[in-house]
Amino acid sequence: MTTNQQNAVVSQPQTVVVKLGTSVLTGGTLALDRAHMVELARQCAELKKQGHSVVMVSSGAIAAGREHLGYPALPNEMASKQLLAAVGQSRLIQTWESLFGIYGIKIGQMLLTRADLDDRERFLNARDTINALVANDIIPIVNENDAVATSEIKVGDNDNLSALVGILCGADKLLLLTDQKGLFTADPRKDPNAELIKEVKTIDDTLRKIAGGSGTTLGTGGMATKLQAADIARRAGIEVIIAAGSAPNVIFDSLSTEPQGTRFLPCSEALENRKRWILAGPAASGDIIIDDGAVNAVVGKGSSLLAKGVIKVSGDFARGEVARVTNSHGKLVARGISAYSSEDLAKITGKHSKDIISILGHDYGSEVIHRDDLVVIQE
């Protein structure tokens, strides 16, 4: 590390979530690259030495399981992936434990599923655990519990999980390490004229189109899912960096004034804790489709959502559950806790608030989703 690099790094203690994809941990091979993993551990140790806190989200369980079993020929199905994850998770955590042990650092394993984030109480318990580990100078190493979770072994699992972990621990920065140098104007593997995008202030449809599709054979994430994760994290006030895991000092440089890769600036107004949970925690159980007037009121004025602006309801959700709010073209506008079940809401779509009680026979308030329970997604 050069003197200039040291001078460029922020001195104020920060919490950094480091997400390591399978391609980074294997170097594109079929086995864990322990030589590179020890270098990543060294960089995390250097951050801690400087007074910063580190939380790691580590993929690689399936790759570790495949290696330990001698690369068996298994059917490409969920049960095979869960088998490999069950065998490999212990191997992965043992590897990290031995590597961090070189630097005198203790680690703690946390395996999460969507259910741990859907429920508000379990979400808070997970938050307390991860914060307790950090407070006791232990690096939490988080992974999805792929051995039992069926919906998580899909594109975007640990990318999105890392954003949620960032919200759990109140991170200042989220570092998504991959096999690419960052987000480019086109796929650099196909277009020699592709240019690295150094800084992103707003994530729009153009960027989503650039990000494209899926990941590698061993991993499940691609650039599109990293963009999803970046969007979630930055809305919670977390700065996000997508960079190459093979780049020298990439983890330490994440705290510099000019980090490597693509830097996503956080939204200017960070969400309060309850809204962070609405954004990150529960999976939406259905969609509430609203008209243009309601979109303008919710997005432009920060208003609550009224039944008058609802066009249609899809899915099945109970009162108090989270629903997606979309415009008439299906574009996501917001997420929020519905005061009415999907069954009740279907009966009062397009109706004035004063008519709700006469239609339903009961009334949970004039708002379908109160603005305090609503997180705007559209910018």
Curated annotation (Swiss-Prot):
UniProt GO molecular function: ATP binding; glutamate 5-kinase activity; RNA binding
Predominant location: cytoplasm
Family membership: Belongs to the glutamate 5-kinase family.
GO cellular component: cytosol
Cell compartments where the protein resides: Cytoplasm
Source species: Vibrio parahaemolyticus serotype O3:K6 (strain RIMD 2210633)
GO biological process: one example: L-proline biosynthetic process
UniProt-recorded name of the protein: Glutamate 5-kinase
Catalytic activity entry: L-glutamate + ATP = L-glutamyl 5-phosphate + ADP
Residues annotated for substrate binding in this entry: S59, D146, N158
Positions that bind ATP: K19, T178, D179, T220, G221, G222, M223, A224, T225, K226
Annotated EC: 2.7.2.11
Residue ranges of every copy of the PUA domain listed in the record: 285-363
HAMAP family, sorted: ProB (MF_00456)
Family annotation (SMART domains): PUA (SM00359)
UniProtKB keywords: Amino-acid biosynthesis, ATP-binding, Cytoplasm, Kinase, Nucleotide-binding, Proline biosynthesis, Transferase
Principal EC category: transferase
Protein purpose: Catalyzes the transfer of a phosphate group to glutamate to form L-glutamate 5-phosphate.
Pathway assignment: Amino-acid biosynthesis; L-proline biosynthesis; L-glutamate 5-semialdehyde from L-glutamate: step 1/2
